[in-house]
């Protein structure tokens, strides 16, 4: 049995946090935070696979939180949520490192699919890196033996 992915939901609106938590907790380990400080405390404590953050967190910015989260040694995949959806906001979030963007009101099936797609993408990136490392190692060993034989 595999360990479920860890999701962090960051939103200053309690009903949004709790609704998402209830929707996702059957498939994932879910943490919730109401602001950037709570989110960073969780992120620094345990590795988080995916962070869903609202654009506006009271007086704080979800964009800034993404920037902080991506500087961690094990950065989460970041997905921006907002009721203030615009193409400009989506582009800016992705320029700052967000994997994707979703608008409120949230379609819970869409959020679930988006998270699973993000996790699959990260898994494929890790597998690709490992295969690349193995190929490089193989060719360096073959080059070594070619030099030894000549």
PLM feature segments, named:
Residues 132-150:
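AAA+ ATPase active-site-proximal loops
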Residues 2, 14-31:
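Two-component/phosphorelay signaling modules centered on CheY-like receiver
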Residues 11, 54, 82:
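Active-site residues of response regulator receiver
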Residues 32-50:
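Acidic, metal-coordinating helix/loop segments flanking the phosphotransfer/catalytic sites
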Residues 41, 56, 63-74, 92:
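Short amphipathic alpha-helix used as the core "switch/output" element in two-component signaling
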Residues 35, 61-64:
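Acidic catalytic/metal-coordinating carboxylates
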Residues 86-88, 102, 106-115:
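C-terminal output helix
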